[in-house]
Amino acid sequence: MEKILVTFSTGAASIAVLAVLFTVPSLYNTINEVHDQVLDGVSVFRVETDSAWTEMMDIQITVTPPTKPRVNPFNSVFRQKRQTFSGLPAWCQCEPTKPTCPPGPPGPPGQPGAPGTPGAPGPKGDDNTATFAPLTCAPVSQDCVKCPQGPAGPAGPSGPAGPAGPDGQPGFPGQRGNDGFPGAPGAPGDNGQPGTPGQDGFPGQPGADGQRGSGAPGAPGAPGNAGPAGPAGQDGFPGQDGAPGPAGPAGQDGFPGNAGSDGQPGAPGGPGLPGNDAAYCACPPRSAVFLSRH
């Protein structure tokens, strides 16, 4: 009993160790995939927020009158780090694109703020003499998106069987079969009717007187030879038909029929699935890109 328990425990422990060895790499790969997906999502989110922030700043600059840019007082003390993108691949576009469309309609008015303290009256400003060219957008293309053809749909179901073909020409007559074995002799027929009695013969001459014998009677003689066979009787009535014999063996299989006609073509396949999203490249931090442009 103890040997059985030890063997069972050892087998269970071995199975558990093997399960752990096969499960840990799978969990590690799953965690790495989730980590990569999270990093990709964060990168996409940062790119979208940078683009939105840049568009908001451009709209604000377009709507509000141009003012003198604010100078960073620490530029004279600390040297600004130079941004370079020469180490990135050619397909990476890390700098935010500048919008070329006019600003949208103004948003709803916000909540009124608290009244501030009245400021001192400023000097009279100069008349504005600068003019700006109107902003125009590139024409929007109305062409349809040309997608690649989807994969072929599954094959349609088989069509119904075609109608049976016409009967063929009649075959040549077969050869005459061999004679069968002679039948068993029939049962003997019934006895025939008795014949008519013959005519009486003429009376014979009277015999001579015999002598009285004196001896004892002798032994009986041997039986005589059999007489000739009598005439054959009439044929008997035909016997009843015998019981049917057992069924013969099955004949050979017939020739295969002609192939049926092809079925109707299947329905066209559905539209293909959309392609995977394009991969994003790692971009520098938003603050450095924004400061380099503004």
From Swiss-Prot:
InterPro entries assigned to the protein according to its UniProt record, in alphabetical order: Col_cuticle_N, Collagen
The signal peptide here is 1-30
Q: Under the GO molecular function aspect, what terms does this record hold?
A: structural constituent of cuticle
Q: Is the keyword Ligase in the record?
A: no
Q: Name one Pfam family in it.
A: Col_cuticle_N
Region span, Disordered: 100-133, 148-276
- UniProt keywords, alphabetically: Collagen, Cuticle, Disulfide bond, Repeat, Signal
Region Triple-helical region: list its residue ranges.
Answer: 102-127, 148-277
GO terms under cellular component: collagen trimer
Compositionally biased tracts (Low complexity): 164-194, 219-265
Query: Where in the numbering of this chain does the Collagen-like domain appear?
Result: 218-276
Ranges of Pro residues composition bias in the record: 100-112
UniProt record similarity statement: Belongs to the cuticular collagen family.
Q: How does it assemble?
A: Collagen polypeptide chains are complexed within the cuticle by disulfide bonds and other types of covalent cross-links.
Known role: Nematode cuticles are composed largely of collagen-like proteins. The cuticle functions both as an exoskeleton and as a barrier to protect the worm from its environment.
Q: What is this protein called?
A: Putative cuticle collagen 145
Which organism was this protein described from?
Caenorhabditis elegans
| Organism classification | Eukaryota, Metazoa, Ecdysozoa, Nematoda, Chromadorea
Q: Which gene encodes it?
A: col-145
